[in-house]
Amino acid sequence: KTSRFLHQRNQYVVNQLGYDHLYHLIRVANVLHSDNPDQVVHDLMDEYKLEYGSFYVENVNSELCSRIPTELDMGKVYARLIVDTLLPNEDYIQGLIRIYNDAICQVIDDYTNGAYYEPSYVKARAYKNGEF
């Protein structure tokens, strides 16, 4: 949600927050989920000095993509990819940072190429192979 609101890629937000802040946010997620989502985004913007960008996830060819996945849809996709590719001795936050800093995100976030719609195991295999 934060990335979409800011018109930034997920990589930007993850890197601006860093490991310690992401760890904290995951720990308090059950509380934050009961807060107003827009207020949470604004609080993150203020606290971490997040800036607006120029990446518009909805800027796709409508002939190739009739429905943009929701933030929740994408969160599920990335959560599965993180868990499916966790490395030995790597925690979830380290995996999250690793995935969001990988080129596969640009492929998955391009809803016109079909990668988003592939089953989880195909995305995990593509990540491990370094390409779709």
What are these regions, as identified by a protein language model?
Residues K1, Y19-L22, L72-V83:
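Short, hydrophobic/amphipathic alpha-helical patches that form generic packing surfaces
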Residues N30-T70:
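Long, compositionally biased
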Residues D20, H24-A29, E47-F55, D84, ...:
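Amphipathic alpha-helical interaction segments
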Residues N15, A29, V57-V60, D91-G95:
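Short coil/turn segments at secondary-structure boundaries
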Residues L6-Y12, D91, N113, Y117:
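Short, charged, surface-exposed loops that flank catalytic or proteolytic processing sites
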Residues G75-I97:
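Long protein-protein interaction modules used by eukaryotic assembly/scaffold proteins
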Residues K1-M45:
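N-terminal interaction modules that seed assembly of large macromolecular complexes
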